Amino acid sequence: HLMYIFIALSMTKNVTFCFDFGSPYSYLAYNNLNSIREAGGEVTIMPVLLGGIFKATGNQPPATVQKKGEYMFKDINRWSKKLDIPFKMNPYFPILTVPHMRGAVLAQRENILEKYMQVMFEAIWVKAMNLNDQEILTNIAEKSGIDPNQFAEEISSDEIKNKLRENTEFAISKGAFGVPTYYLDDEMFWGIDSVKFLLDDLKK
């Protein structure tokens, strides 16, 4: 039996998924993670700060270039229809996601990250709520099971801040310049449209 377990473990392919709630493509990618799992990928979710990645790489948000921004919104709608994922453009975009992403690190520590991601992504990209409002943010976090007082206290703690910084620096060191970004060992895949190549590699 141990031999079978060893073989199964050695065949597991680890995929690291880096995301930020402020990225609508991260929302689509999160909802599409099952396709990676079904192809044999063991997914490790890594909250990162997109702003930190942009700063380190000199990249700019697509919406800062008018025509690029206009195209991006069309493209997201195409992808949401193709993947059959509900999507509504958030009128409060851009969402400044530092506290949201620190909350994700906290949720990961508390073993409720996927629940937290579900309610947070839904609030931003389906219900189109104003997640720049601290009170709304705290209420959404509470829906995932985080006590509001704990949330407020912990997202200001050095432990949580440092972990998010480490995650972001890891992604940058591996070549990230945006999100969603996936890593299969040292191979990087960026964007929702690269998932098909990731799935091909997983099936090899």
Where are these regions (language model features)?
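C-terminal cap of thioredoxin/glutaredoxin-like
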Residues: N14-T16, F21-T44, V119-K204
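Short, surface-exposed alpha-helical recognition segments that flank or form part
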Residues: H1, F21, T64-K67, I155
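Generic detector of short, locally flexible boundary/turn motifs and exposed helical patches
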Residues: S10-T12, G52-K55, K67-E70, S80-K82, ...
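Structural alpha/beta surface segment adjacent to cysteine/selenocysteine redox centers
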Residues: Y25-K127
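Short, Lys/Arg-enriched N-terminal segments with co-localized hydrophobic residues
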Residues: H1-S10
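Short, solvent-exposed beta-strand edge segments and adjacent coil->beta transition regions
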Residues: T12-N14, H100
